[in-house]
């Protein structure tokens, strides 16, 4: 059976950075990002901040669970893709064929018990709030077409509250907590070595 490694943490904590670095070392691992399971806002004009992207209900949780369950059963899936500029799901999907170990990353992947039960190793990236905010600000402005004002307003109105209400409490479910995500070379080396061994030797660790 496929082993699923979950990497969670607040927005800007360094999840994607760690995953990208792991992928450079171990390219045979498949990555599934929870970001692709955001619900479409719709094809109409709206006030962006009326949509709370920092709440579990912002995700298509049923689809996320069903597809992870298929991955766990070594079945291929067609993963959705999300357009963060237009805030809707794209028409195209990506075919994902499971590898022995699959990495799943996202801010709320530990929120639902049914999803947690599918994850064999739970990793939480614990990064200071100011660092996370700066990273989120840079990312949203450079890659998601956001303005400085909109990012700050969203952070103050929903992101900060969502982190303390939904994300930080899931730290208690983690098997491993990594501080300073994305810039912790020692932790990255240990994690990469472990995943490489796991991919070769299978389920001996679980």
Swiss-Prot record:
Keywords: ATP-binding, Cytoplasm, Kinase, Nucleotide-binding, Transferase
SUPFAM superfamilies assigned to the protein according to its UniProt record, in alphabetical order: P-loop containing nucleoside triphosphate hydrolases
Catalytic activity reported: uridine + ATP = UMP + ADP + H(+); cytidine + ATP = CMP + ADP + H(+)
Keyword Cell inner membrane carried by entry: no
GO function terms (MF aspect): ATP binding; cytidine kinase activity; uridine kinase activity
The keyword Cytoplasm is assigned to this record: yes
UniProt record, GO biological process: CTP salvage; UMP salvage
Principal EC category: transferase
Family: Belongs to the uridine kinase family.
PANTHER family assigned to the protein according to its UniProt record, in alphabetical order: URIDINE KINASE (PTHR10285)
UniProt protein name: Uridine kinase
Organism field: Borrelia hermsii (strain HS1 / DAH)
Name of the gene: udk
């Amino acid at each position: 059976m496929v082993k699923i490694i979950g990497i969670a943490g607040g927005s800007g904590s360094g999840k994607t950075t760690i995953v990208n670095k792991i992928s450079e070392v171990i390219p045979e691992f498949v990555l599934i990002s929870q970001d692709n399971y955001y619900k479409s806002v719709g094809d109409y004009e709206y006030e962006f901040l009326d949509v709370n992207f920092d709440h579990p209900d912002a995700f298509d949780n049923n689809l996320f669970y069903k597809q992870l369950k298929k991955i766990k059963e070594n079945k291929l899936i067609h993963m959705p893709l999300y357009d963060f500029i237009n805030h809707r799901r794209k028409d195209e999907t990506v075919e994902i064929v499971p590898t022995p170990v699959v990495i799943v990353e996202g801010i709320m992947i530990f929120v639902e018990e049914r999803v947690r039960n599918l994850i064999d190793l739970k990793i939480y990236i614990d990064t200071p709030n100011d660092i996370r905010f700066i990273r989120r600000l840079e990312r949203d402005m450079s890659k998601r077409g956001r303005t400085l004002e909109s990012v700050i307003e969203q952070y103050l109105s929903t992101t900060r509250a969502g982190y303390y209400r939904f994300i930080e409490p899931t730290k208690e479910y983690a098997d491993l907590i990594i501080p300073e995500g994305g810039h912790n070379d020692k932790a990255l080396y240990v994690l990469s070595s472990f995943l490489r061994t796991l991919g070769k030797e299978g389920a001996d660790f679980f």
